[in-house]
């Protein structure tokens, strides 16, 4: 059986590079545990260095 589609606690998000605006990563986030937006230092392949990536919606 497949997963239920609806408003669960876990949502799929994308991580967007602050310097280039490119969506490099996708991950999940539990809304009950983390209310604020996710901000992580991740590797940006276009710039070839670690940059700040912020949470964004998946289109």
From Swiss-Prot:
Domain of life of the organism encoding this protein: Bacteria
Record-given protein name: Large ribosomal subunit protein bL33
GO molecular function, one term: structural constituent of ribosome
SUPFAM superfamilies: Zn-binding ribosomal proteins (SSF57829)
InterPro entries for this protein: Ribosomal_bL33 (IPR001705), Ribosomal_bL33_CS (IPR018264), Ribosomal_bL33_sf (IPR038584), Ribosomal_zn-bd (IPR011332)
UniProt keyword list: Ribonucleoprotein, Ribosomal protein
Keyword ATP-binding: no
One GO location term (cellular component): cytoplasm
GO biological process: translation
Keyword Ribonucleoprotein: yes
PROSITE patterns: RIBOSOMAL_L33
Pfam families on file: Ribosomal_L33 (PF00471)
Signal peptide: none
NCBIfam families in the cross-refs: PRK00504.1, PRK00595.1, rpmG_bact
Family affiliation: Belongs to the bacterial ribosomal protein bL33 family.
């Amino acid at each position: 059986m497949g997963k239920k589609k609806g408003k669960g606690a876990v949502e799929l998000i994308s991580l967007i590079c602050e310097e280039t605006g490119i969506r490099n990563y996708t991950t999940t986030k539990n809304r009950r545990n983390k209310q604020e937006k996710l901000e992580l230092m991740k590797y940006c392949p276009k710039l070839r260095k670690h940059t700040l990536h912020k949470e964004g919606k998946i289109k």
